[in-house]
């Protein structure tokens, strides 16, 4: 259930030109940090950099105080998240979990909607159909990772998921960075920047993700917006590759991969949209 490290995003020539202009504007104050992990009051640009000018907070802004194009419930195209993720939809997922599951009283629609306000780019930036597909994809992966919101933390807690080579995000003594939350965020190099972006000590207190449902959803959405959101238009298979490609794609574990596809198809049907092409990886 551990989340795989996402690869570096590919940047086109046109993006490099725009990125260069954005970096020139850094003199005005923004501190560039690839793949974001920005402070709460700083925007994450469509190319994954932190800043506060229009180049960062304008068109394509992924998270933070976006000024245009992001739009949590309006603007920038896409789907109205609160209208799509109804109580019936959310609780319908939870109802599939057993009565003794710890997550049944932890994961709530209100916690998700509270968290998604911090990520106005989620389910936005394209058409309403594309927005609904992104919502279906997010919940398909969350369903697979948590067993219909049954599990809060990874079952096997023996692995510390500490990568000492990631010196920017040093592991704290006695802490383990195993999977927690809707997407089972794992590894010190994910907890560290997620905590910095959300506003908690991800390295010193990774357990916060398992104690606070809003933080849990924010951590999942942080990973999603930084590592998955950009590949959603490529098809559901690309989102699986971004989350757990090393373990499930390329024939490594077709049963697990196809289980994700099954949930995605189911949720697309519920939301009234075609799942689109390229569902497998």
Swiss-Prot record:
Quote one Gene Ontology molecular function term.
Answer: chitin binding
Catalytic activity line of the entry = Random endo-hydrolysis of N-acetyl-beta-D-glucosaminide (1->4)-beta-linkages in chitin and chitodextrins
The EC designation for this entry is: 3.2.1.14
Protein family (similarity comment): Belongs to the glycosyl hydrolase 19 family. Chitinase class I subfamily.
Provide one Gene Ontology biological process annotation.
cell wall macromolecule catabolic process
Function per UniProt: Defense against chitin-containing fungal pathogens. Its action is countered by fungal polyglycine hydrolases, that cleaves within its hinge region (Gly-rich) to disrupt chitin-binding.
Q: What class of enzyme is it?
A: hydrolase
Region Catalytic: which residues? Answer: 79-281
Per UniProt, subcellular location reads as: Secreted
Which cysteines link up through disulfide bonds? 36-44, 38-50, 43-57, 61-66, 101-150, 162-171, 249-281
Region (Hinge region (Gly-rich)) location: 69-78
Does the keyword field hold Signal? yes
UniProt xrefs under PROSITE patterns: CHIT_BIND_I_1 (PS00026), CHIT_BIND_I_2 (PS50941), CHITINASE_19_1 (PS00773), CHITINASE_19_2 (PS00774)
* Protein name, entry field: Endochitinase B
